């Protein structure tokens, strides 16, 4: 087996019906990982050319055809620095990160999967599919990034979801509920969509800031750190991002910097308010009626 030293994790979404129709719904970039498990996904990838996208998509369709596959599935590949790709595995189900594909294609993958199970044909062809915009998903885990991403447990003392244009939250928790030790520590999937990668990224940063969770540690600060990192912004990253770019103390530095900025802004507002108040003379605060009465 070939050793790939700096791999990107790229997967292709496919749908196959019982009538022999198979399509690929483009790729998802899943290279931001910890413990070889995904934390941030996006679609489309920042590095795939249209030609490579088509080649990988057709390869994924070929995998599905080779085993007479029916339903929704994901064919996963490793992509090396020279853009050679290698088959990794096929997941015979909908992935956690399927919402980013729904966002850029406008296709409801859950509905299509149900229709396929009912024996219906796909409602679209490969030629009908187009990439529109860009989407990110961050997995909101009850984990402590400062402690090697160990799972955390406790009660969601505060749980307020972000809202707004291009923001989607898939979850199953409410304020006051318990995060137990018995299951996967994922709390939610936070998804943003924009007309391009930068707009989707900015919306994700805003959504993370607005997501209020207390009672357990979460991966939100780590995701924010990643989204603001130069390597991520440029698209120059691989599955070794955490190893090469992240240290737990960076989160403390980031929070301290934000607190300092907030304090400076607050001081500036107080100063401006004080100056405005001081500039108002007593005569300006009196009504004309009172002034006339005093003459």
Model-assigned labels for residue ranges:
Residues 1-295:
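ATP-dependent carboxylate activation and anion-phosphoryl transfer catalytic cores
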């Amino acid at each position: 087996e070939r050793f790939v030293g700096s791999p990107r994790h790229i997967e292709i979404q496919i749908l196959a019906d019982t009538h022999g129709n198979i399509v690929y719904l483009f790729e998802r970039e899943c290279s931001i990982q910890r413990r070889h498990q995904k934390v941030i996904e996006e679609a489309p990838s920042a590095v795939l050319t249209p030609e490579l996208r088509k080649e990988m998509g057709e390869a994924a369709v070929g995998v599905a055809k080779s085993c007479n596959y029916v339903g929704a599935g994901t064919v996963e590949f490793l992509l090396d620095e020279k853009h050679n790709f290698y088959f990794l595995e096929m997941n015979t189900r909908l992935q956690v990160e399927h919402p980013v594909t729904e966002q850029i294609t406008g296709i409801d993958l859950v509905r299509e999967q149900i229709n396929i199970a009912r024996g219906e044909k796909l409602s679209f062809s490969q030629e009908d599919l187009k990439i529109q915009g860009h989407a990110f998903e961050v997995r909101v885990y009850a984990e402590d990034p400062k402690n090697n991403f160990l799972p955390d447990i406790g009660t969601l003392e505060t749980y307020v979801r972000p809202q707004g244009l291009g923001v989607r939250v898939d979850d199953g928790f409410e304020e006051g509920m318990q995060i137990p030790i018995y299951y996967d520590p994922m709390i939610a999937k936070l998804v943003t969509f924009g007309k391009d990668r930068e707009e989707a990224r900015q919306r994700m940063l805003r959504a993370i800031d607005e997501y209020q969770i207390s009672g357990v540690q979460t991966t939100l600060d780590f995701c924010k750190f990643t989204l603001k990192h130069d390597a991520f912004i440029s698209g120059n990253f691989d599955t070794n991002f955490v190893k090469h770019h992240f240290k737990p103390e960076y989160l403390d530095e980031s929070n301290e910097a934000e607190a300092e900025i907030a304090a400076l802004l607050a001081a500036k507002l107080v100063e401006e308010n004080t100056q405005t108040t001081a500039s108002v003379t007593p005569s300006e605060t009196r009504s004309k009626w009172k002034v006339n009465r005093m003459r």
